Amino acid sequence: MIYLKINKPIKKGTLIGLDLASKSGYAIIKSSNKKVSLVSYGSININRHSNELLRLHNTATLLVRTINPFIISKNTLITIENCYLGKWNPRTYGFLSRLSGYIIPSIINAYRGILTINNFKLLYPSTSKKLVGLKGNANKQDSVNYVNNIINNKRLEFKLIHNNICDAVILALAGGFDKEVKKC
C-alpha cells in the first residue's frame, strides 16, 4: 500500500482509473478518513496485430479479473478516459471508442448487483488533468512528475514508460474529487 499526499477533499471508497488503449493502464485507490492509498496499479498490453474483437474481449476479461478483488461494495467509482481525437488517427479513435463501449457493460455484467452505470465516470484527459491541478495540455512527463510528487514512497518512482499507469492514477483521483471543472 502506497500512501498519497492529497490536499483536496476526495470521495471515500474505492476509486479505479482506467486509461484504455492498446496498452491500458489501471490504478486502484482506496480513500477513507483523510488517508488515500494506491493499492494496485499496472498495465495490460494486448497484441495490436490480433483480431480487433479478440483484443476487445481480452482487454475486458483481463481488466475485470484485475479489479475483481477490489470491488467489494457499491462505494466504488470507476473513471475511464473518454475518447478524444488526439493526432487524428481514425483507426485509433474507432478502436478506443469501441473499447470504452465494450468495457463498461463487461464490468457491470461481471458485478451485477454491486455496480450500475452510476458507478462510472467518463473524463477527457484535459479535464482529469485540470481536476488534479495540472494544465489541461500537460504532457506525459508532466503527468508522471505529478504522480511521483504525490507518492509518499521514496523507493517507487515512475518513469515516462509508465505514463499509462500515471494517467490511470490521475483519472482515479480526478473521479474522486467532488469539484467539477468547467468544460474544456
Regions found by a protein language model. Name each.
Residues 1-184:
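Phosphate- and other anionic-substrate recognition elements at nucleic-acid/protein interfaces
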